[in-house]
């Protein structure tokens, strides 16, 4: 038997399921969860939180709800799905090859990055712009991805660049998210 555990066999470029690997023989199994379903839930939870707290979440009152995104591994199907899920739910996703682009945006202070777009959200008669201010793969100097320490450093860089424009912090996994929360978001009361 062949057992794929916690990572679906997938293309490192697109994140699409490798059906040949998954169906290698009659005793091939995948043990894990549906990455796309989890991604949709994550994106919807972020959107629901923004809608519920729209009157207080825009910290500087500029009408732009800015978020930063810690991307785990640009070639990992879970990371690709989670990035796409958040961008789809928030309306900031841009189509690339029939799916939402999961490429890191780098910095996007003016909303003109090619891999994301500004979105609008109407809540109780008020229109907000939703903007992905920055995103990057959390890869350390040794090449390890999903790196919590790199995420903690990234939030420091992002806050120095964007300050009170950051209204929401989003992460592809809990370790990176906790690092950003402990390094900055908790003290600044940013979800």
What positions do the PLM features span?
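A residue-level marker of the well-folded mature domains of exported/periplasmic proteins
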Residues: 1-191
């Amino acid at each position: 038997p062949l057992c794929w555990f916690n990572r679906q066999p997938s293309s490192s470029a697109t994140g699409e399921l490798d059906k040949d690997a998954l169906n290698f023989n009659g005793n091939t199994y995948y043990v894990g969860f549906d990455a796309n379903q989890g991604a949709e839930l994550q994106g919807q939870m972020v959107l629901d939180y923004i809608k519920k707290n729209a009157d207080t979440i825009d910290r500087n009152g500029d009408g732009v709800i800015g978020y930063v995104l810690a991307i785990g591994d640009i070639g990992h199907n879970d990371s690709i799905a989670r990035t796409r899920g958040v961008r789809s739910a928030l309306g900031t996703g841009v189509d690339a090859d029939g799916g939402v682009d999961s490429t890191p945006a780098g910095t996007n202070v003016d909303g003109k990055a090619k891999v994301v777009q500004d979105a609008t959200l109407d809540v109780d008669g008020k229109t907000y712009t939703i903007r992905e201010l920055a995103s990057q793969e959390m890869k350390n100097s040794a090449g390890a991805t999903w790196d919590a320490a790199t995420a903690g450093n990234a939030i420091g860089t992002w806050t120095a660049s964007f300050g009170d424009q950051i209204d929401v912090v989003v992460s592809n996994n809990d370790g990176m998210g906790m690092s950003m929360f402990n390094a900055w978001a908790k003290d600044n009361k940013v979800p």
